[in-house]
């Protein structure tokens, strides 16, 4: 649709990937798909999802060395077929759950491996992208939030950027609009953390401190009025009361508040309109929002399976 609306080639909008069969194998079916598209001018990415203790060594050092070798192999293939000269490294390494055989996304070894690969990318002067911001939890919960932040924060500190897959749960089996609202709150907090703070004559506030004096209060100063909105993050769902006031207001948790917000949004009239081809080319992200909107409008308040959403 986008290609027809802009007069450009379909390959300009094409995106697809096949995956290595670790350890050290590019499967026959995947290779055939790769070649078929390449012969027609369509570039297909090659990904890795190595598991420590499963398709790679149980030690992180061993698994990382294997993943690096496979990434270099992929780079050589892309260079031979497409002339790619840039070296891109990324990491989606995670430990295999030895009790249940699960490929988990919310374990601490995952960001640890990603930070180590980021250091290797810096050594080789390569670009880097880490896989983060996911959860194994099946419902909106403390588990989900902790796992998403646990995997995103180390990459944010090491690389200066990270992402959270808003709304995804159970690795990527479930989409929840409730979790999406909670993830927006977590993302906003991480953005505030990443922004840091300025040290200037104004922000050091020596004059204001002298004005307030020992035992004084800064709340009613002009300096506080000028700066608190930009300096202090303002939560939309997080607690802003002590326990007694929270109980008097109904003892609602963050999940309760997110559910209320979701129901409020869904109760509003649907104002979605059909876009012209020009609007599609100008605002391609609108299509992604419409896909999410279609998921939310199915009537499932808590969760929507990603397979149905596609």
Task: Put a short name on every predicted segment.
Residues 1-161:
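Helix-rich catalytic cores of soluble enzyme domains
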Residues 8-11, 47, 82-90, 125-131, ...:
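Flexible, glycine/charged-enriched surface loops at secondary-structure junctions
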Residues 51, 94-97, 128-132, 163-173, ...:
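Short acidic (Asp/Glu) and glycine-rich catalytic loops that position anionic groups and cofactors
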Residues 56, 62, 172-173, 180, ...:
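Flexible, active-site-adjacent loop/turn segments at secondary-structure boundaries
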Residues 114-219:
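Hydrophobic alpha-helical bundle architecture
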Residues 178-310:
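Catalytic-core signal marking the mid-to-C-terminal active-site face
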């Amino acid at each position: 649709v986008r290609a027809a609306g802009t007069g450009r080639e379909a390959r300009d909008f094409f995106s697809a990937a096949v995956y290595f069969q670790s350890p050290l194998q590019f499967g026959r079916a995947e290779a055939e798909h790769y070649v078929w598209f390449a012969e027609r001018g369509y570039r297909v990415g090659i990904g890795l999802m190595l598991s420590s203790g499963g398709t790679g060594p149980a030690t992180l050092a061993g698994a990382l060395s294997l993943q690096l070798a496979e990434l270099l192999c992929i780079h050589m293939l892309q260079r031979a077929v497409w002339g790619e000269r840039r070296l891109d490294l990324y990491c989606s390494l995670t430990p295999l759950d030895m009790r249940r055989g699960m490929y988990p996304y919310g374990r601490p070894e995952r960001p640890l491996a990603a930070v180590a690969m980021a250091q290797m990318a810096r050594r080789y002067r390569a670009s880097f992208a880490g896989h983060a911001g996911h959860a194994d939890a099946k419902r909106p919960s403390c588990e989900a939030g902790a796992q998403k932040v646990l995997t995103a924060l180390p990459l944010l500190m090491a690389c200066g950027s990270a992402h959270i897959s808003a709304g995804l749960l159970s690795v990527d089996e479930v989409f929840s609009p409730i979790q999406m609202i909670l993830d927006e709150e977590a993302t906003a907090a991480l953005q505030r953390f990443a922004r840091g703070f300025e040290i200037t004559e104004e922000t050091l506030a020596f004059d204001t401190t002298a004005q307030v004096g020992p035992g004084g209060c800064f709340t009613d100063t002009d300096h506080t009025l000028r700066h608190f909105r930009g300096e202090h993050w303002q939560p939309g769902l997080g607690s802003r009361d002590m326990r007694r006031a929270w109980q008097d207001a109904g003892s609602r948790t963050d999940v309760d508040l997110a559910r209320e917000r979701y129901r409020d949004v869904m109760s509003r009239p649907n104002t979605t309109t059909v876009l012209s081809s020009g609007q599609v080319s100008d605002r391609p992200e609108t299509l992604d929002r419409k896909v999410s909107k279609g998921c939310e409008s199915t009537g499932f308040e808590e969760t929507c399976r990603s397979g149905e959403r596609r």
